[in-house]
Amino acid sequence: MRRLIGFCVVLWIGIALQAQSLYPDFSKMNFGCDGNSITAGEQWSKTVVDLLGFATHHNVAVGSATWACHSDTQDYGSAGFAGISGGWRPTEDSHELQMRHNNVSKVHIQKFIAEVENGQYPVPDVFVFSMGTNDKNLGSAEESLKGKTLAEVDVTTMAGGARWAIQTILEHYPKCRVFVCTPIQTGDVTRNERNLEKIAILREICRA
């Protein structure tokens, strides 16, 4: 994971500053991203792609997503895989609950890689993660970085899920420039204090 990972708050500015010096022609670059509701669909990432003129836009973000997995999260494409849901309203539907438990970065990244490998999308030149707002079980950067392999990482914590997702993208696409965007400020003081904890964890993981 010892590769350059940028933190950007103003997303398109961050990407432009890092990428322009190496890739002045964005029309030859492919853009990928993962995140939660503020990234899902054609929101800021679509604006980035359009303004800078990226060749492709591969977005696997889903609303309500977290870095952390659940104890019953399924691998993407595994036997009996239920799918992914961004639902958040109360429900007792077991299939819907399983799909919600699959709405995590690990599964999103498995989906992203599968779609590249089957030819739906090209290998990314730039990849942006923008999530963490919905995470509750933070864990610690120190614990998440102890394992030598990703199989040893506890992905049921935000820290572990983040390490798994970021490192997996870097290992699969070593030439890709990866950016990690931290949770945005809110009008809630308590929530902002919690976000500062998340930011510190993500920063430490990215510097490892």
Cite the ranges covered by each PLM segment.
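Positively charged n-region of N-terminal signal peptides that target proteins for export
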Residues: 1-4
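Bacterial N-terminal signal peptides
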Residues: 6-16
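Boundary at the C-terminal end of the N-terminal hydrophobic targeting segment
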Residues: 17-21
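Conserved SGNH/GDSL esterase-like catalytic core that processes O-acyl groups on lipids
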Residues: 25-33, 38-152, 156
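N-terminal cationic-hydrophobic initiation segments that often serve targeting/anchoring roles
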Residues: 49, 169-171
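A general structural detector for well-ordered alpha-helical segments in enzyme core domains, enriched
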Residues: 112, 158-165, 198-202
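Substrate-gating cap/lid alpha-helix
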Residues: 168, 179-208
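A short helix->loop->beta-strand "cap" motif at the edges of active sites that frequently abuts
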Residues: 173-178
